[in-house]
Amino acid sequence: MVAMNADVTIEVLESADDSVLEAFVRLIPLLSGSAPVPDRERVERVLGHAGNTVFAAWGRVRAGEGERRILGLLTLVVIELPTGTEARVEDVVVGGEARGLGLGRALVLAALSAAAVRGVRYVDLTSAPRRVAARRLYQSLGFEPRETGVFRHTLDAYR
């Protein structure tokens, strides 16, 4: 657990209780209008996958108001390859009411720290050009644009 202040902490999610499921249902659609809303089984598979570490920013938008809840999420995916251990940061999302509070930065820093502990050599992420603030954040944390292209093949079962 990483403490940000008295009201916000960054924690690794281990199980899909109702509050965790509610956060995924509320936050994941903010990533993409085409992303399916995850159900409990999906969230449990994500949390239980050996290569995944899911970080949550728990807190209150305004100190002392209401119950603590998940305000943001990030998934760190560690990949063992013949060339070394690498990682990807995926599905970084902070709810609109909590944007600008430094949660994205705290989530990414927690992921980078966890990756370093696991012996990761590189951490990659992708970010759409329209996400100007997010791209600025990633660059401020040491991520550099790469001269590469991302290719995607959609399997027939998902068309």
Could you say what each language-model-derived stretch is?
Residues 1-18, 156-159:
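Conserved N-terminal entry element of GNAT/NAT acetyltransferase domains
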Residues 79-89, 99, 146:
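A conserved beta-turn-beta hairpin within the catalytic core of GNAT-like acetyltransferases
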Residues 56, 66-78, 88, 93:
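Conserved beta-strand in the GNAT
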Residues 45-59, 88:
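A short helix-loop-beta-strand connector motif used in the catalytic cores of GNAT acetyltransferases and
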Residues 105, 129-147, 152-153:
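Conserved active-site alpha-helix within GNAT-family acetyltransferase domains
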Residues 115-127:
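Conserved GNAT acetyl-CoA-binding A-motif
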Residues 94, 100-113, 136-140:
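Conserved acetyl-CoA-binding loop-helix of GNAT-fold acetyltransferases
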Residues 25-37:
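Helix-loop element at the rim of GNAT/NAT acetyltransferase active sites that forms part
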